[in-house]
UniProtKB/Swiss-Prot annotation:
<protein>
    <recommendedName>
        <fullName>Sec-independent protein translocase protein TatA</fullName>
    </recommendedName>
</protein>
<keyword id="KW-0653">Protein transport</keyword>
<keyword id="KW-0813">Transport</keyword>
<dbReference type="Pfam" id="PF02416">
    <property type="entry name" value="TatA_B_E"/>
</dbReference>
<feature type="transmembrane region" description="Helical">
    <location>
        <begin position="1"/>
        <end position="21"/>
    </location>
</feature>
<comment type="similarity">
    <text>Belongs to the TatA/E family.</text>
</comment>
<dbReference type="InterPro" id="IPR003369">
    <property type="entry name" value="TatA/B/E"/>
</dbReference>
<comment type="subunit">
    <text>The Tat system comprises two distinct complexes: a TatABC complex, containing multiple copies of TatA, TatB and TatC subunits, and a separate TatA complex, containing only TatA subunits. Substrates initially bind to the TatABC complex, which probably triggers association of the separate TatA complex to form the active translocon.</text>
</comment>
<dbReference type="GO" id="GO:0043953">
    <property type="term" value="P:protein transport by the Tat complex"/>
</dbReference>
<keyword id="KW-0812">Transmembrane</keyword>
<keyword id="KW-0472">Membrane</keyword>
<dbReference type="InterPro" id="IPR006312">
    <property type="entry name" value="TatA/E"/>
</dbReference>
<feature type="region of interest" description="Disordered">
    <location>
        <begin position="43"/>
        <end position="98"/>
    </location>
</feature>
<keyword id="KW-1003">Cell membrane</keyword>
<comment type="function">
    <text>Part of the twin-arginine translocation (Tat) system that transports large folded proteins containing a characteristic twin-arginine motif in their signal peptide across membranes. TatA could form the protein-conducting channel of the Tat system.</text>
</comment>
<feature type="compositionally biased region" description="Low complexity">
    <location>
        <begin position="66"/>
        <end position="79"/>
    </location>
</feature>
<dbReference type="GO" id="GO:0033281">
    <property type="term" value="C:TAT protein transport complex"/>
</dbReference>
Amino acid sequence: MGAMSPWHWAIVALVVVILFGSKKLPDAARGLGRSLRIFKSEVKEMQNDNSTPAPTAQSAPPPQSAPAELPVADTTTAPVTPPAPVQPQSQHTEPKSA
């Protein structure tokens, strides 16, 4: 009773065709295949990276002489003063006394 019968699969397939349309299904399947292929190659590459031993310190090239110091640009700037805040003008006018 818990397993999917062929009728269940047919209904699921019909719903998928109705939702995505028969024209988009081949493109979706192609994209899914490409994604799986890329995923498999990345997993395989990660496994190969883990299986190769890390290079030892003895095989590292000898250190080169210290690089010459580069001139440092002057990063100081003049202080910037912020503009004065603008006071909002009143929209209504008070009646003038006579």
